[in-house]
């Protein structure tokens, strides 16, 4: 049965970095995809799930492929053996959508029947339009399928150990995952063994802890709330002799900007929380601080 491999290229800033034995993640991913033995196409320039499905349906029609193997162009650890297992399960059980569960993200592609793609394309424009209009993410195909999941024959290839709790993502979409890829590649373990790679990653401090993805900033001492289990008022009174509801100190805009600049430089992509202790709305420069955070493409705000 004819299949085709499609890699979606997000054009992220790290995928072209030649740090993997003088090769980039994009080059290694393409090489891995070509080892599957099928035609490989790389697509880009799409923004919504609906647009993605439209393009995938078009590719199936043009190529005459009965099934489509989908992944992202920066997944340098794309695994041939795992992919073969997915295809075997997909065809043996006549599945419409097959994916790997429990393995780190970036090791396995997703497999779809061409008819499933056509159906999802229509769903993304009609009953599931709200999902279809969403920006493409690494979970887009599953997200659109979940809108009517009982209508599809979905099969799963399970990992021998559930590594999901580690939240691994071996791709190069951001600095955090890019560094993890570098450290895993430096281990020298063959890409052919997804289990050995996963076991190594789960024990490697360099992979588990790359750069922070979340920061908490306290913008104001004052807090009008009276939470039964909150230790903040008692500790503030003990250390500084002031009640939380009467505290007056706030972080200056200049100091906040310095911290935000350092966060952006160090982590690249991160969530900045503004509700560590105290009530951030007591800082008169709150809106300016939020604007400063959002001036960096890789930073977002949590209040």
How would you name each of these model-derived features?
Residues 51-67:
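Active-site nucleotide-sugar/metal-binding loop of Leloir-type enzymes
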Residues 76-105:
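Conserved donor-nucleotide/metal-binding helix-loop-beta segment in metal-dependent transferases, i.e.
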Residues 1-44:
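N-terminal glycine-rich phosphate-binding loop and ensuing alpha1 helix
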Residues 85-96, 116-136, 147:
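Basic phosphate/pyrophosphate-binding loop/patch that engages nucleotide-derived ligands
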